[in-house]
From Swiss-Prot:
The gene is uppP1. Belongs to the UppP family. Keywords: Antibiotic resistance, Cell membrane, Cell shape, Cell wall biogenesis/degradation, Hydrolase, Membrane, Peptidoglycan synthesis, Transmembrane, Transmembrane helix. InterPro entries: UppP. NCBIfam families: PRK00281.1-1, PRK00281.1-2, PRK00281.1-4, undec_PP_bacA. GO terms for molecular function: undecaprenyl-diphosphatase activity. It comes from the Bacteria. Pfam families: BacA. It comes from Bacillus cereus (strain ZK / E33L). One of its GO terms (cellular component) is plasma membrane. The chain crosses the membrane at residues 4-24, 42-62, 84-104, 108-128, 184-204, 217-237, 245-265. It catalyses: di-trans,octa-cis-undecaprenyl diphosphate + H2O = di-trans,octa-cis-undecaprenyl phosphate + phosphate + H(+). This is Undecaprenyl-diphosphatase 1. Bacitracin is thought to be involved in the inhibition of peptidoglycan synthesis by sequestering undecaprenyl diphosphate, thereby reducing the pool of lipid carrier available.
Length: 265
């Protein structure tokens, strides 16, 4: 199979899975294994296509991101969504990521740990659905600092491969009395700085594995991931309010079984 076709397939996988509660890491490892695309070059490729997904969110939410640069609501102590909400949602994961980055990359990016993350994340999502109460935050402007910080702590779970950033943060939002749409949008916004920081750090360390010959493949993967992520996020927001997290949780358990059969055994 040609590199361009592999790039196209993995770009679709990344674009679909990055902001859905199904674990992009688990999918990329499984599909990469089935395609025979593994090793350091594959890891560097995954970093590049993540940037495509990040760009999609930056464009979809560019107005909200620009509004965060306005510090007047923060200075006036207005009850309105502002940069401090994002800071509270990001800070715990940044600390966890910096402290555990090398340990995670060295020891936790293994197939069996991803299976554990898939199942553990599924259990959390089911529990969140069962335990959720009537939402008090039905828009980003309703979000309290305490709710933002709670979701931020749940994002720390996503440093474990296979757990899923969207799965952990949306679950945390439901448990903190935030509705589906608001929890999802906040999840996307706080993912941006964390992902930009993590992918930049990874790219600096993986730069030596890139060559000029890789540019066409990496470009196809990046563009595909960007387009698919744009479509996936818009569709997901509409779908989540109708079906909730449980179908995604059951899918994760199925993926863990497939992962075990095709990768571990």
């Amino acid at each position: 199979m040609s590199d361009i076709i592999i790039a196209f397939i993995l770009g679709i996988v990344e674009g679909l899975a990055e902001f859905l509660p199904i674990s992009s890491t688990g999918h990329l490892i499984l599909v990469g294994h089935l395609l025979g695309f593994e090793g350091e070059r594959a890891k560097t490729f995954e970093i590049v296509i993540q940037l495509g997904a990040i760009l999609a969110i930056a464009i979809l939410y560019h107005k909200r991101l620009v509004s965060l640069c306005n510090i007047k609501p923060l200075l006036r102590k207005e009850k309105k969504f502002n940069a401090f909400h994002v800071f509270l949602g990001v800070f715990p994961a940044v600390v966890a990521g910096l402290l555990l980055h090398d340990v995670i990359k060295t020891y936790l990016f293994q197939p069996y740990t991803v299976v554990i993350g898939l199942v553990a994340g599924a259990i959390l999502m089911i529990l969140a659905e069962v335990k959720k109460q009537e939402a008090t935050a039905c828009s980003l402007d309703d979000l309290t600092y305490r709710q933002a910080l709670t979701i931020g702590f749940f994002q720390c779970l996503a440093v474990y491969p296979g757990f899923s950033r969207a799965g952990s943060t949306i679950s945390g939002g439901l448990l903190a009395k935030v509705n589906y749409k608001t929890a999802s949008e906040f999840s996307f916004l706080i993912a941006l700085p964390v992902m930009v920081g993590a992918t930049s750090l990874d790219l600096l360390k993986s730069w030596k594995y890139l060559s000029v010959d890789d540019i066409p493949m990496f470009a196809v993967g990046f563009i595909t991931s960007f387009i698919v992520a744009m479509l996936a996020v818009v569709t997901f927001l509409k779908l989540l309010e109708k079906i909730g997290l449980k179908p995604f949780a059951y899918y994760r358990i199925l993926l863990a079984i497939l992962f075990t059969l095709f990768v571990l055994l």
